Amino acid sequence: IIGLELGQVYSTLGTDVSVVEYMPSLIPGADDDIAKPLIRKLKKHFKSIMLSSKVTNVDVGFKEGVRVSIESNNEIKDQVYDKVLVSIGRKPNTNLLSLENTDIKIDSKGFIIVDDYQKTSVKGVYAIGDIAGNPMLAHKATHEGKVAAEVCSGLPAAMDSKAIPSVVYTDPEVAWVGLTEKEAKDKGIEYELGDFPWAASGKAMILNASQGKTKVLFDPETKKVLGGGVVGPSA
């Protein structure tokens, strides 16, 4: 996602951008119909998009630029670029916290292990934010801080990771939260769907955002919202 966000910025500034994505889709976490308007626009912005592909080698000493070896369809080809932006994820910097001098437990990836109340393995010690595990999002860290503070104060609070919204700051913006329609189908969960195409909205037409849409999944009996997605300005 970071690669798409920054890639679109560079593309808008006039740079030819090629994207190499290991997964078979650019935004695997969102439903296809929510991601489709963005992907349609990115195909116009970017010089090329290589899905189900991976970078196997980068030669920064190549005199004509940066030579990148890309594997796709069991075939490796070399491409030469001026610059390479690596945006395959982040890792926690818990190695700088001297946790080996404490009884605080971390997982195999270096994240501090916490429960739904942000409690660590040491009584009275809480962890929030990027060091407490994925997703590494600012709004997730903020809410974790609130949960930890309320638990410390003796108030009933807990973290519900399913309620963490995901956001893609591209043009158009994409956001989704809770259960996606694909997840509901895969898990056999019954749902009803509220689907609103922005082409029916006068304001969306004024904003030149008629390709946007909003969808909400809800329980057919209780009418409880199970999830939702939006694509368009201010999603």
Question: What are these model-predicted stretches?
Answer:
Residues 2-75, 135-142, 150-183:
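Rossmann-like dinucleotide-binding cores of NAD(P)H-dependent redox enzymes
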Residues 153, 170-235:
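Flexible, glycine-rich terminal cap/loop adjacent to redox cofactors
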